[in-house]
Amino acid sequence: MQVNSSVAYGNGTLAQVIGDGAVIRRQLATLTQQAGDGLVSDTLSGLGAGAGGSLTLGSSLTAVQTWQTNAQTASGPMQTAQSALSQISDIASSFFAQTAALNGINATAIDTTAASARDALKQVAGLLNSKFGDVFVLAGGDSANAPVPNDIMVSGMVTGISAAVGNLGVAGAAATIGATLAAASSNAVGVSPFSAALSQPAAVLQGYRPAVQIGANERVPSGLLASANGDVASTGISTTGSYIRDVMRALATIGALSSGQATVVGFGALVQDTHTSLGDAISALNGDAGVMGNRQATLTARQQSLGDTATALQGQVSTINDVDMATTLSRLTATQTQLQASYQLLGTLRSLSLATILGG
């Protein structure tokens, strides 16, 4: 605003200059605030017609940034889960190969393989308890607690399978296979090696799977559970419906074998069932891991696209909320000069007015 510098000796001109000075001071205060924080206004009402657009764009930006963070946060736990599944698959594949050659001819090999299977079962339990930070990545909604909370070797599942295999000569292969399947399938307290949260039917457990929101109406599963399949169903005639339980069952069965059973009727049938079940479990496990890998790639790509969207929205918000700093600083300097001129003019007018009164 240009200050009216016309010189008149009446009180009207003096009042006008005082009013102009007040306007300039308000302008200076606004420009000083804008130069300090870079914002058009520190209140929504100060944005005038741009207030509605700022609110809408700000809400959209917050949502997009949240979805981007969700996608980024899911990456670490998913990678840890992938690593655990990959190692379990390798263990299962090793014993799949060993059971193909396991027979009653080489009794010593039976004891060696059994000891290795017991160690492998402990290793699998440890992998199921893999953590990313403080999160158990295969525990789903119960991520603060270990999926396999206790020593798996003393679980009812393992001791039950061991007892059934030990009774192979009396019960026969079919009954033994049925008993090991029942023990591995059980969610009963004291039998299931899994936590209470994960010792539930697979249909119930689907609600425990971790998922992340990456869009207004888009949630993507971001993990798997230790005790239940995710997207790929287990197949075959000898399965619990869970490839992890099937792997555990196989390792517990192999671990319970002994060289003294080499000539027992039903030994070959039990080993063959274990071999077949392991193969089916490996296929389902690798299938689920593959689906999760694809989702990881999807989340990575979405994270990038959400970042681009956030950048674009930030630019639009900035257009409304932020000042052009170079222009603001230039106006600030000019307004300071204008205010100084106003003070000088006011002083001159007051002196003239006083002189008029005294000389009147």
Task: Describe each model-derived feature in a short phrase.
Residues 1-145, 259-360:
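Amphipathic alpha-helical polymerization modules
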Residues 17, 21, 28, 32-35, ...:
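Polar, low-complexity export/assembly segments characteristic of proteins
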